[in-house]
Amino acid sequence: MSCTPPNYRFCPCCGGSLKTRPRGDRDRLVCQKCHEVLYVNPAVGVAVVVRREDQILWGRRKGGPYQGAWCIPCGYVEWGEDVRVAAAREFLEETGLSAEVGEVLAVHSNFHDPERLTVGIWFAGRVMGGILQAGDDLDEVGFFPLAAPPVPLAFPTDALVVAELKKGKARWTSARPDR
């Protein structure tokens, strides 16, 4: 059984059966009992890009379908959580470092996993404290040159962000020099 939204069969509001019906410019899942429309929206992911001189902090995924692949430290926004608070929380969980979350560097739709569509927001970050150590979803963390990111990359959108940074389309700030 798939948990992707188009495969939902029952209404989360009342338990009634869902049917696909035209609504606006597309087909939508509509409850046959309470008539609620189930809007299928992507999850929001956040990432913090931290620079040390000409290097970026990366983390290697320790499990799941992207095990062994590298990514900019990232995670999901919880219900009711501010995106910057989520970015700082996820960064701390994955790297052991507290960060000041700054400006938005990039926003991309992530279609690489059809089971879990997301919109990602990449923020500039500055390390404020802590000890660099892999945690949560990562088994290794380290700084790599912007010109030579680690391979393989878990998420193709991280490559887009790196390309934007290389071209100067996104500005970024530095980590504290002592970190």
Predicted feature residues:
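Nudix hydrolase/Nudix homology domain
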Residues: 1-7, 134-179
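N-terminal leader/linker segments that precede catalytic domains of diphosphate-processing enzymes
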Residues: 1-65, 76-93, 97-107, 111-129, ...
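A short local loop/turn or secondary-structure capping micro-motif enriched for an aromatic residue
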Residues: 65-68, 142-143
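Short, glycine/charged-enriched secondary-structure capping and boundary segments
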Residues: 63, 72, 117-120, 138, ...
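Conserved acetyl-CoA binding element of GNAT-fold acetyltransferases
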Residues: 69-75
